[in-house]
Every structure is written in structure tokens, then in C-alpha cells.
């Protein structure tokens, strides 16, 4: 009997991580199904980015115990686009791959993110939003089973941020990777995710499933109710909810 593929599944069991004696993640247990879009919320220092970096195989010098596995190909999308300034946009996308073989797919992704005319451009000539679109295309060119996104739109202005959120959602619906998004923006998590986790003191304090069709409206009663719940759990006073 053929066993189902684990590609895209994420599994943590009894996972802890500390830096210089400070416990950041504490005995985490978590299962994420392939294709699920999960948002991580929490105050600064709650362990969101540490969890993401553990799944990406980073910070190996940290003291860790337990299991943290992201099955299949993993791509990471950072807040900083991390485009190399001495390479063109297209060459940044294909870096580390068989450039000749993936060039058609790279060109198609640039068209999909609205950068078809920027393939030969230098990163310094791009706006912040354009750089993040290029970074998203670069991540998806790797055909990831798991996409780890660490506040990828945090440095963008409000309008560009909304456009990028819509672009990410459309691209994810087409490619269907598992997505784990670290964000401080409650509305962003509600607009994009299928499941929202709240981290507190290195533990998963809350786990919310969202059963709202896309595109989502912030004035939908269920959206507003969960928004209020999440804001309160993050310490926002009732008068601001």
C-alpha cells in the first residue's frame, strides 16, 4: 500500500530552543497539514521568528531539543528582500538553480507578480514593494512544499502592503504550498490565514481555525469577532478593539 506523501507537512514534538541560557521556545507540539496557511501572532520575544528559523534549519548553534521538521522543499521569505545588488532581478531569481532550465518559469513568475519589464533591472532601481514581489517570485521558483514568511510586508507602506497581501494569497492559491506567516498584524492574519496561532512565552497559547471564504471582508461579523478576541489576547485594551 502506498503511503501518502509527507511533503508540505510540518511537525513539532517537544521542541525547545534557547539562546545563551534564555528559553525562547518551550516544549512545543504542533502539526500542520500540507497546504495549510498558518499565521503566527504574538508579542515581540514570544518566539515567532525563532520557530520559523528553526523550521528553516537556521541558528543551528542554538541549544535545541525535541523535533522540528518541515517536510519537502522549504523556501524562506524575509522582511528584507535580500536581493543581491550586483545581480539583475532575473539572475537573483535563478541564483543557485539551473538558470537555463528555469528561465521560462522565472519569466512567467515575473509576469505574474507584475515585474516582466524589470527582469534586466538592478535591485537598487526597484521600490520596496517591487523588491518584495521579486523576493516572492524567487521563493516560489523553488517550488516549495513549505513557504516560511517572516513579516515579509512589515516595512511596506499601507497601500503596498494590501496589494502584496492580495498577491501572496493569489500566488499561494495557485501553487498550494504550506505557508507559515509571522506577522504582528492581526488583520493581515485574518485576511490570509486558514489557521492562527498565538505564541506566548515560547508556548502556543491559542489555536484558531478560520472558516471564512476568500476574499474576506473586515466587516464580516465572524472576522470582527475573532479580530476582537485576538487583539485582547495580545493585550490591546477593550476601548481600542
Curated annotation (Swiss-Prot):
Catalysed reaction per UniProt? ATP + H2O + aliphatic sulfonate-[sulfonate-binding protein]Side 1 = ADP + phosphate + aliphatic sulfonateSide 2 + [sulfonate-binding protein]Side 1
From the Swiss-Prot or TrEMBL record, what is one GO molecular function term?
Answer: ATP binding
Indicate where this protein is primarily found. membrane
Which residues of the sequence carry a binding annotation for ATP? 42-49
In this chain the ABC transporter domain maps to 10-226
Q: Which GO terms describe its cellular component?
A: plasma membrane
Q: What is its EC number?
A: 7.6.2.14
What SMART domains would the database entry show? AAA
Q: Tell me the compartments it is located in.
A: Cell inner membrane
Q: Which Gene3D superfamilies match?
A: P-loop containing nucleotide triphosphate hydrolases
What the record says about family reads:
Belongs to the ABC transporter superfamily. Aliphatic sulfonates importer (TC 3.A.1.17.2) family.
Q: What does this protein do?
A: Part of the ABC transporter complex SsuABC involved in aliphatic sulfonates import. Responsible for energy coupling to the transport system.
By what name is this protein known?
Aliphatic sulfonates import ATP-binding protein SsuB
- Give the gene name: ssuB
Amino acid at each position: 500500500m502506498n503511503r501518502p506523501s509527507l511533503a508540505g507537512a510540518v511537525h513539532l514534538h517537544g521542541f525547545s530552543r534557547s539562546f545563551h541560557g534564555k528559553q525562547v521556545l518551550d516544549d512545543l507540539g504542533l502539526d500542520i497539514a500540507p497546504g495549510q496557511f498558518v499565521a503566527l501572532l504574538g508579542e515581540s520575544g514570544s518566539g515567532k521568528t525563532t520557530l520559523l528559523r528553526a523550521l528553516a534549519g537556521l541558528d543551528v548553534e542554538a541549544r535545541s531539543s525535541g523535533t522540528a521538521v518541515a517536510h519537502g522543499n522549504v523556501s524562506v521569505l524575509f522582511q528584507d528582500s535580500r536581493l543581491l545588488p550586483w545581480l539583475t532581478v532575473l539572475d537573483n531569481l535563478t541564483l543557485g538553480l539551473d538558470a537555463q532550465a528555469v528561465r521560462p518559469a522565472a519569466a512567467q513568475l515575473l509576469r505574474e507578480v507584475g515585474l516582466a519589464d524589470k527582469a534586466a533591472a538592478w535591485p537598487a532601481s526597484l521600490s520596496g514593494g517591487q523588491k518584495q514581489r521579486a523576493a516572492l517570485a524567487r521563493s516560489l521558483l523553488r517550488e516549495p512544499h513549505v513557504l516560511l514568511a517572516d513579516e515579509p510586508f512589515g516595512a511596506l507602506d499601507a497601500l503596498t502592503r494590501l496589494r502584496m497581501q492580495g498577491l501572496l494569497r493569489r500566488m499561494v492559491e495557485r501553487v498550494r504550498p504550506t505557508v507559515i506567516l509571522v506577522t504582528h498584524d492581526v488583520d493581515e492574519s485574518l485576511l490570509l490565514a486558514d489557521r492562527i496561532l498565538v505564541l506566548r512565552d515560547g508556548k502556543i497559547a491559542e489555536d484558531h481555525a478560520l472558516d471564512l471564504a476568500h476574499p474576506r471582508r473586515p466587516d464580516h461579523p465572524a472576522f470582527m469577532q475573532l479580530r476582537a478576541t485576538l487583539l485582547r489576547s495580545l493585550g490591546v485594551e477593550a476601548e481600542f478593539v
